[in-house]
Amino acid sequence: MQKIASSQETILYRLGSPCYKNRFYILTGPGSRELLARPEVVGFPCYSALLEETVAALRYLSSTGMGGDLDILTILRGGLNYPLEEACALAGIRVRDMHFLSCERIIRDHVITGLDIRYEKLRPTSGRVLAIGDIIASGATLRKCLD
């Protein structure tokens, strides 16, 4: 993981590995750190905590040539909503298409044992950036959604 940009308390990292064909970025800032420390925060407070730092990261990526048109994949999980579409609009990035995965954790005896995809609208366009906004602690849900 390589730090590629920082602004005040917000840091943007790029994940790098010879086995990756795609580019992956991780954003951390005051809002995302607050959500990790207070997982009970859901709904609009969750959404608004992430907006400013997401706009800053998108503006940075756009200034380095990563802007332009893109598709968005939103992973719907109860009260956790990532503000990627609004952040793109504020950063001047055009969203061409929206894709969705709705998932629900499978819990047995108070242990998360899997993930059930309840709804899927995922038809990415070849040659276009697919931006995924998600709140990741371990990455397990994201990996299962993309499998």
Residue ranges of predicted features:
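PRPP-associated nucleotide enzymes
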Residues: 1-147
